[in-house]
Every structure is written in C-alpha cells, then in structure tokens.
Swiss-Prot record:
Protein name stated in the entry: Deoxyguanosinetriphosphate triphosphohydrolase-like protein
Organism: Rickettsia africae (strain ESF-5)
Any single Pfam family the record assigns to this protein: HD_assoc
Single Gene Ontology MF annotation: dGTPase activity
BP-aspect Gene Ontology terms: dGTP catabolic process
Domain of life: Bacteria
SMART domains: HDc
InterPro entries given in the database record: dGTPase, dGTPase-like, dNTPase_2, HD/PDEase_dom, HD_domain, PHydrolase_assoc_dom
Family: Belongs to the dGTPase family. Type 2 subfamily.
Length: 384
C-alpha cells in the first residue's frame, strides 16, 4: 500500500494532451513503456558511460547504466512505500539527453553552443520527450504525465536563478513548479544514479586497469571490504573481488539511504506529497557520514579515472569529433537530413545552431565517428 506522501498514479496531475487511461497499466507504467519504446532510449546502448562502446563488451554504456539505476530506484521506493513505477520511470529517462562520448561530448557541445545559450543534457531529456520524439500523429513528444516530467527536470533539486531556455519555454504551457523540490520518487532516482555510477565506475575502472585495489586504500570505507574479503576468501580472484566489493558497497549505500530518509520523514511528520515539495531541503538523503564518503569517492574518480591519461586522450579525440561536426553542419546546413533541416526557422543562425546541437546530441558514438570520417576527417578514425 502506498504511503500518504507517495505519488499515486490514480491521482496524477495528468498529461498535457488528454488521453483515455488503459485498463491494464497505471499511468506511470504507461510512461515507463513509452520511454522504453523511444528511439532515444534504444540509442543509449551505443553511448558512452565512461569507456567508449567498442573498448570492451562488458563496460557499461548509458543504457546498462540507466537500467541499473532503475533497479536501485525501484527497490528503494518499494521499501519506503512510494511509487516504484514512478521512481523506475524517472530513472530510465534521466540520461536520455546525453550526447555521444559521455561528459567529454557534452562539454564539447556546450562549448560550441556558448553563444547560443549553451547545452544541458537535463533540458535535452525534456526536449526529447516533449518535442523531438515523433511517434504520435496528434502531438510531438510522447505526452508523459506531469509527475514524470517534473521528476526528470527537477530530480537534482529546485531550479532557481537562470533557467534553461527550453525548460522555461515548456514550463509556460505545463507548469512544473520549478522552484520546489520534486517528489520523493524523483529524489530517489537522483540518488540511485549516484549509487550506481560511483559503484560501477569503480568496477569498470579496475577492469580497465586504470586503477587497482591498492589505490582503493584512499577510500577507507571501501577498502575495509577489500581487506575483509581477502581475509575470508584467501584465493579470491580479482574479478570476483571487485564484484563482491561493489555488491557490498551498493547494499551499504542503499541501507544508509533508507535509514536516513525514514528519519527525515518521521522528523518532519510528513503526511502528503505537497509537504515534501515545499520543504527547504530534500527529504531523501544519505547520512552525513555517507554523503562525505560519496563526495570523496566522486573526487577520487575525477582525479584517478576521468582525468587519467587514457580517458583524457580519448576525451580529446571525442571533443575534436563533436566540434568538427558542429562546424561542418553550421557551415553547410544542407549536410543535415531533410527532416532535420526543416526544423530550422528560415536561415536564422540561432535556430540553425539549436537544430544542429539537437542532431549531434542524438547521435550514438559510432554514428558520430562515421559522420566525422565522412564529412570532416583527413585521417580515418576507426577506434581510439
């Protein structure tokens, strides 16, 4: 049974375009299925998480990451008697707006768009789901419920100060109450993302030999699991060791998140969802100690993995590809597919730049490489 402060699909604020409910799915399940059926969701399987897709079959990509986030989000929401369908749906959609080549691609595209209000993957997720996906005759986008769109836009907290152009534009027709916190389910999806990416980026980085178990000594709360497992299983293999460490880490983080969130709910005597939205802090959270550990882990990953020689070398090539594609399309808009070219308002530079950015952002790693080789490169790129 759902808690009184859960997002109840029977009490959803509905969709921008009215639709008749189905008898065999609730509204959030329906949204989940719509997201899974989008082209943007399928393309995630060929978009970088940390390692380029072709570097190894077992490294995570944006799709496998999103699936892992969704399982954590669903488990946490269920335990707290919240809507696991809503938490899962927001988690599945949270990375739809990412560019090819991970954060390197996003930084490069944001730099290209500096004169045109920049690029934000979060806003791009909203744009994909409300405009760019063309699956219905009656409207653009996939017409998701208010709660799912709110969660996608605000899962990292209220949007204050300068608001992204597309979010502001969309908000005029469908007010997402940007200055308040999102539902508890959306907050869960955001922290499930943290749990998944720090755990699995550590796993993939050890698999890629960018870091080793000795370097994990810098993270005492993780190293204690390494020491304990080596003591208990004398002949444990390195591959099995990292799986066990990650399993224990995920369990530890979820348990901590559940404990602190229950404490917050009891302390605030929360009885309805509006009380969650109107708090001055997020109700779903880790303990102070765990937040500190997570912050240290993110710093460790940034310095030891994302800035490593291997990742930096790849990132430079990815940046070159994204910037090269942006320039060549801006110089000759006729290189865009006809259906994309039709989206440009006359020959106005700003509109042209936004359409080019939307097109590049939707590319997979391999398609971006293919386009670059065909349109820009004098030296053929096959892999990094």
């Amino acid at each position: 049974m759902l808690a009184s402060y859960a997002s109840d699909p029977l009490k959803s604020r509905g969709r921008l375009y009215k639709e008749i409910p189905t008898s065999y799915r609730n509204e959030f399940e329906r949204d989940r299925d719509r997201i899974i059926h989008t082209n943007a969701f399928r393309r995630l399987q060929y978009k970088t998480q940390v390692f380029i897709n072709h570097e190894g079959d077992h490294y995570r990509n944006r799709l496998t990451h999103s699936l892992e986030v969704s399982t954590v989000a669903r488990s946490v929401a269920s335990t707290l008697n919240l809507s696991n369908d809503l938490a899962e749906t927001i988690a599945l959609a949270h990375d739809l707006g990412h560019t090819p080549f991970g954060h390197a691609g996003e930084r490069a595209l944001n730099e290209c768009m500096r004169e045109y209000n920049g690029f934000s993957h979060n806003a791009q997720s909203l744009k994909i789901l409300t405009l760019l996906e063309k699956r219905y005759a009656a409207y653009n986008g996939v017409n998701l419920t208010w709660e799912v769109l709110e969660g996608i836009v605000k899962h990292n907290g209220p949007i204050l100060g300068e608001i992204n152009e597309y979010i502001a534009e969309y908000n005029k027709q469908n007010d997402l109450e940007l200055s308040t916190y999102a539902s508890a389910e959306a907050q869960i999806a955001a922290l499930a993302d943290d749990i998944s990416y720090i755990s699995h980026d550590l796993e993939d980085s050890i698999g890629a030999k960018i870091i080793d178990f000795h370097s994990l000594a810098e993270l005492k709360y993780i190293d204690q699991h390494v020491v304990e497992l080596k003591s208990k299983f004398k002949n444990i293999s390195s591959s099995c060791l990292i799986y066990e460490v990650v399993r224990k880490l995920i369990h530890e983080l979820i348990t901590d998140l559940l404990w602190q969130t229950k404490e917050n709910l009891n302390k605030e005597k929360i009885t309805n969802i509006d009380e969650i939205r109107n708090l001055n802090y997020q109700i779903v959270d880790f303990t102070e100690k765990t937040n500190k550990n997570i912050k240290e882990t993110k710093k460790f990953l940034h310095e030891r993995v994302y800035k490593s020689n291997k990742i930096t070398a790849i990132s430079l090539k990815c940046t070159k590809i994204v910037q090269g594609l942006f320039k060549v399309y801006m110089d000759d808009i006729n290189l865009l597919p006809v259906n994309w070219k039709m989206l440009i308002d006359s020959n106005e530079t700003y509109s042209k730049a936004r359409v080019v950015a939307d097109y590049i952002a939707g590319m997979t790693d391999r398609f971006a490489i293919q386009e670059y080789n065909q349109l820009c490169s004098t030296s053929y790129i096959t892999c990094f």
